[in-house]
Swiss-Prot record:
The keyword Zinc does not apply. It is an enzyme of class 3 (hydrolase). Pfam families: Phospholip_A2_1. It comes from Austrelaps superbus (Lowland copperhead snake). PANTHER family: PHOSPHOLIPASE A2, PHOSPHOLIPASE A2 FAMILY MEMBER. It is found in: Secreted. This is Acidic phospholipase A2 S1-11.
């Protein structure tokens, strides 16, 4: 490959990186997203959960609107508890897990914060998979005050 071609390729790659409107995700959220896909067997994209109800996605307030939103509130509360009592950073905690026939399973060798966060994520992912998804509850922050 000619040096000029390499420069053009590099320029394209750099411009694509700058054009991305998605902020970098904490490592754990990537794992959690994969767990959700494992639990629901790919039936629903993870993006459907990013702005659902009052608690699915960043932050949360008000009263959960349904069973799925309650799953998100419980998960948020668990992360808050992990930050306080376990003194860990759940959004950045990396753990080992596998996708089994009955959903995500945490590696038994994990201990401490890794075990707690993996357990919270696996439980939430299974809860998401069981809960009905109501399209009317997507992007409703005005009802969550």
């Amino acid at each position: 490959m000619y040096p000029a071609h390499l420069l053009v390729l590099l320029a394209v790659c750099v411009s694509l990186l700058g054009a991305s409107d998605m902020p970098p995700q904490p490592l754990n959220l990537v794992q959690f997203s994969n767990m959700i896909q494992c639990a629901n067997h790919g039936r629903r994209p993870t993006s459907n959960y990013m702005d659902y109800g009052c608690y699915c996605g960043k932050g949360g307030s008000g009263t959960p609107v349904d069973e799925l939103d309650r799953c998100c509130k419980i998960h948020d509360d668990c992360y808050g508890e992990a930050e306080k009592s376990q003194k860990c950073a759940p959004y950045w905690t990396w753990y080992t897990w596998k996708c089994g026939s009955d959903g995500p399973q945490c590696d038994d060798s994990e201990t401490g914060s890794r075990r707690f966060v993996c357990g919270y994520d696996a439980t939430a992912a299974k809860c998401f998979a069981k809960a009905p998804y109501n399209k009317e509850n997507y992007n409703i922050e005005t009802r969550c005050q």
